[in-house]
Amino acid sequence: MSSDYEKEVLRRTLEHERGTWREDLRRRFAPWFDPLVWGFRCHDGWSGIITELTEEIARIVGGPEGAPDLRVVEVKEKLGGLRYYVWHVPEKHALAIAEAKQRAEERSFETCEVCGKPGRLVQSDGYWHTACPAYEDPRSFRGD
């Protein structure tokens, strides 16, 4: 970690994630999520998709021991879909991991990011997100 700022962001992120699926994923698949300074930048509705994708990557490579240099560097929502960025993927597993990521990203466009119920891609005031009817208005979950 390169700066005091990043260390403070990580400290706050880990504090925020304490007791959640995010903390569990970091624990189960360490060192893959070390440091993931910015945390998981999406709502809890995609927790199942993210967990299943991570478990699938683990099956593909043989667990963290099979790819000790692999790093999940960012997990976020972008333009309504899941983005899961991984570095240092073993070349022999690159295609299988890319296909697994593609399937997870496709599922995210059918799953409400907030609650995990079936959803659809919607646009509201220039903001694209995947939501069920209860969360189509971004103000319903962003606190605006």
Regions found by a protein language model. Give the residues of each.
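Interaction interfaces in information-processing and related assembly proteins
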Residues: E15-A98
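Eukaryotic low-complexity, non-globular regulatory regions
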Residues: M1-Y5, V9-T13
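Cys/His-clustered metal-coordination modules, chiefly Zn-binding fingers
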Residues: L95-D144
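Aromatic-residue detector
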Residues: E8-R11, T20, W46, V114
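Sequence-level detector for tyrosine residue identity
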Residues: Y5, H16, Y84-Y85, Y127, ...
